[in-house]
Each structure stands twice: as structure tokens, then as C-alpha cells.
From Swiss-Prot:
Component of the Mediator complex, which is composed of MED1, MED4, MED6, MED7, MED8, MED9, MED10, MED11, MED12, MED13, MED13L, MED14, MED15, MED16, MED17, MED18, MED19, MED20, MED21, MED22, MED23, MED24, MED25, MED26, MED27, MED29, MED30, MED31, CCNC, CDK8 and CDC2L6/CDK11. The MED12, MED13, CCNC and CDK8 subunits form a distinct module termed the CDK8 module. Mediator containing the CDK8 module is less active than Mediator lacking this module in supporting transcriptional activation. The keyword tRNA processing does not apply. PANTHER family: MEDIATOR OF RNA POLYMERASE II TRANSCRIPTION SUBUNIT 20 (PTHR12465:SF0), UBIQUITIN SPECIFIC PROTEASE HOMOLOG 49 (PTHR12465). It holds the Pfam family Med20. The gene is MED20. GO terms for molecular function: transcription coactivator activity. The keyword Cell inner membrane does not apply. It comes from Macaca fascicularis (Crab-eating macaque). This is Mediator of RNA polymerase II transcription subunit 20.
């Protein structure tokens, strides 16, 4: 894999989530991007079981268990303000056995799914973010394949993002700053998705200026 930028795109004014996704994919196809199947990233939140908390008033920690269709044999466990553990797919079974320590938060599952596009050295994924039956937002992931160091290719990623996102082009992800000259890996992408999902969970239903 290369270096990836994950961002949330606002819903276009007067349009639905699905209509905005169609606008974005149409722009990609006009650039010459070709469809390359589908993708899905999901996330379920677990919190520390009450029985494991010592003193009264002590707050529990959160853990996010995530899957990415690009890595079908792996499961990612991201601890709140902590490391990312990459395990095999049986990790979900282990979480059931650890229910005395971590409990699944009610109605916490959130996911994004959509279409993959290939454009030259860029892999683009435009997804609809859902919680339960409701569409909550739009995710865009862009990967630049030939490079594995974020600082070496951010300018190229930015230029490509601007070509179809315009004024909604995101800034450099926080994870880039933390790993300026380090080799980029799958865990860095999952951290970006975790941050995007948490942002969408917290968002209030207020109007925003979207894509035109």
C-alpha cells in the first residue's frame, strides 16, 4: 500500500447524501477514473467494563474494533489515545470472551461503504457513512500507491484532491505530523477512519455549506 488521506466531505446544499456521492463519483469518472470494485470499513466501540474500574468516578477507556475490506484477514483494535493492535479476524471472537473487561457499547456500529476508483497511481474510495439504517455522512479516501513516506508525497496528494474536491480539500491528516518521515502503514489509515467516525458521531444536525 501507499500513503493515504481520509476525509469527510459535507453534503451538497439542497442534496441528499446519496446525491452528493453521485456528484463526487461523476467528477472522478470525468477525470478518467475507472471503477475497481467496492470497499467497506466498519467500527464497533467497546468500553471498559464497570467491574474493572477501581475507585469511584474513574472513567473507563474506549477501544475501537475495526475491519477494512482491503485487509480481509486482519482486525484492527485501536485504544483510546493509545496504540493500534493488528490481529487476525478471530479477534472478534476473543472480544466476546473478554466481556468481563470490555463491553460493546449499544448501537455503536458505524461503517462506510462505496466504490473504489483507480486513476493513474491514485486509488480513490468514495463511501456513504451509516449508523444503523441512517446515512450520516460521506467519506473520501485517496491513496497514492508509489510512495510510503507521507512527507514525500503530500503535495501530490493535495494537488489530486483539489482536482475534484475544490474548496473542500482537507488539510494534512494529523497522523502525517506524527509520522513525518516514517514508513506509512495500514494502522495509520485506520486511525484516520476512527477519527472520522468519531467526528461524525459527535456532529449535530446543523446546516453546512456543501459541494456545489
Amino acid at each position: 500500500m501507499g500513503v493515504t488521506c481520509v476525509s469527510q466531505i459535507p453534503v451538497a446544499e439542497g442534496k441528499s447524501v446519496q446525491q452528493t456521492v453521485e456528484l463526487l463519483t461523476r467528477k472522478l469518472e470525468m477525470l478518467g477514473a475507472e471503477k475497481q470494485g467496492t470497499f467497506c470499513v466498519d467500527c464497533e466501540t467497546y468500553h471498559t467494563a464497570a467491574s474493572t474500574l477501581g475507585s469511584q468516578g474513574q472513567t473507563g477507556k474506549l477501544m475501537y474494533v475495526m475491519h477494512n475490506s482491503e485487509y480481509p484477514l486482519s482486525c484492527f483494535a485501536l485504544f483510546e489515545n493509545g496504540p493500534c493492535l493488528i490481529a487476525d479476524t478471530n479477534f472478534d471472537v476473543l472480544m466476546v470472551k473478554l466481556k468481563g473487561f470490555f463491553q460493546s457499547a449499544k448501537a455503536s456500529k458505524i461503517e462506510t461503504r462505496g466504490t473504489r476508483y483507480q486513476y493513474c497511481d491514485f486509488l480513490v474510495k468514495v463511501g456513504t457513512v451509516t449508523m444503523g439504517p441512517s446515512a450520516r455522512g460521506i467519506s473520501v479516501e485517496v491513496e497514492y500507491g508509489p510512495c510510503v513516506v507521507a512527507s514525500d508525497c503530500w503535495s501530490l496528494l493535495l494537488e489530486f484532491l483539489q482536482s475534484f474536491l475544490g474548496s473542500h480539500t482537507p488539510g494534512a491528516p494529523a497522523v502525517f505530523g506524527n509520522r513525518h518521515d516514517a514508513v506509512y502503514g495500514p494502522a495509520d489509515t485506520m486511525v484516520q477512519y476512527m477519527e472520522l467516525f468519531n467526528k461524525i458521531r459527535k456532529q449535530q444536525q446543523v446546516p453546512v455549506a456543501g459541494i456545489r
